[in-house]
């Protein structure tokens, strides 16, 4: 009941309003506020009032300006980065090692025989053109291979030479086309006296040939290698996985010796997987079974020591132009992107790799964009088929592969295959190279992937420092190679060469790690503190002053509402009065209007014999009766009976 009465009184106060105008409200506020300055506006003289008005308005504007900047800074959701150093036993990273040569040439040579012969012809073409400006006639056995019947697969990616000796009239020659079978029209005389300027390019077109472009290369070496790689991909993509694994390097042939923390290990301690670029690769301490090796001391003796045999004699000549191994340090249960993030190890040397660990902790929404498991990223992670964790790199390559399938109708060989898609080849996808290079150079597609893929919230980053020395030394070369040869194939003779082996040492350089942590830079406490600081500095105010101002603001609103209601009522009353232009009737006119003659008594001689009863059905000219006037005795006024009162007094 008490609560009900309180609400009723509050409602009456709200309906009644402040009870004064704006000027009275302003005077009341200046007299009662705790803010410095407003009181001077009503107690000082005219000049000081003007001066203090200027001060108050200026400082109030400064306060609001500073408040706007502070709120804008708070809503930017900024973060601060802190760096701390810790000491503990650390998980040894996963180590992936690959031979830069994917397959043994002795096993893959039958598949590449025709392609290798064609590359020999290409090199002869380039040499002849650069010296005398002519293209030699192709060998007769190769002539029939692409002039009769259907064109060979490599014809889908034409290799052309652009002669820029005459800058105003450059000539384009298809090296493998019909115009390549005879010398060009360029004279040999000019070429002998003037060096020929030409460049090699791909002439790529869509399926119907309506859109074409040239992909230029800085040298014929890069052009031939790139062209050979595309043809190699076309051949290898058709082979089953088991055959590709069988053509690669086995763990027994590749890994000669292994030590971890002073304990012996071998290729059985590595996990083998097939890499599209490097063939069979081997991962140490991948952690797929949940077991991760921990190191408690820094130094070479507590790390991983490997001796690898890359066997250069089995290198594919036109595909692999570098010799050595490629290794990558990464976290457990993540895919090793060796081709983009790996490091080379040189043959005939020992490469020592010191490892430093950085632990990065990022903040999520609204302070940043990161993901814990990648499930909130709107891209299918194609590397999840390996049961591996999400990484930024896996998202980028998955995004590119999905765009490749959507744009070109087939998948690129170096990345995992999406469900329902097939790898590109020259027979079924004649314009796949044209589509691939357009997609690769498209900034829109790159930006789309960069904007869609986000980093993980918690990540380990490995920083490495490398140093190298010759291995083995000349004095120890003989006995080391004897021992390694015997351990590998029980041979008493030396079957290894310096240009085919290398040693790799990986260890923690320092037994500490850095933690890079993002934290909130502007929280609510920071915002309120700075808002109050600015208000107090410029106007000497506090939170209570803001409440006072809010009270005055509400009163101003109610004054405006009440005035509007009064104005609206007065307007309605004026509209009602305007409908009656004549003066209002008097009381006598109203009474006369309510008098009906039909109810007045008629003077009829009922005793007269001639009197007849009225015919109720005859039409009458009398008006329709209205409402009769009141004739109640209680409403009649009688004169005062003075005599009666006097008599009663006498009694």
From Swiss-Prot:
GO terms of molecular function: ligand-gated sodium channel activity
Extracellular side: 72-541
Chemical reaction(s) catalysed: Na(+)(in) = Na(+)(out)
Regulation of its function: Originally identified and characterized by its inhibition by the diuretic drug amiloride.
Ranges in the topological domain labelled Cytoplasmic: 1-50, 563-651
Gene Ontology biological process terms, A to Z: sodium ion transmembrane transport
InterPro entries: ENaC, ENaC_chordates, ENaC_CS
Subcellular location: Apical cell membrane; Cytoplasmic vesicle membrane
Membrane topology recorded in Swiss-Prot or TrEMBL: Multi-pass membrane protein
GO cellular component entries: apical plasma membrane; cytoplasmic vesicle membrane; sodium channel complex
Compositional bias of kind Basic and acidic residues: 633-651
Tissues showing expression: Strongly expressed in gill, kidney and rectum and more weakly in brain, eye, liver and muscle.
Segments for region (Disordered): 612-651
Transmembrane segments: 51-71, 542-562
Keyword Methyltransferase found: no
Entry keywords, A to Z: Cell membrane, Cytoplasmic vesicle, Disulfide bond, Ion channel, Ion transport, Membrane, Sodium, Sodium channel, Sodium transport, Transmembrane, Transmembrane helix, Transport
Disulfide bonds: 98-281, 205-212, 258-265, 370-457, 395-453, 399-449, 408-435, 410-424
Assembly notes: Component of the heterotrimeric epithelial sodium channel (ENaC) composed of an alpha/SCNN1A, a beta/SCNN1B and a gamma/SCNN1G subunit.
Similarity annotation: Belongs to the amiloride-sensitive sodium channel (TC 1.A.6) family. SCNN1B subfamily.
Role: This is one of the three pore-forming subunits of the heterotrimeric epithelial sodium channel (ENaC), a critical regulator of sodium balance and fluid homeostasis. ENaC operates in epithelial tissues, where it mediates the electrodiffusion of sodium ions from extracellular fluid through the apical membrane of cells, with water following osmotically.
Protein name: Epithelial sodium channel subunit beta
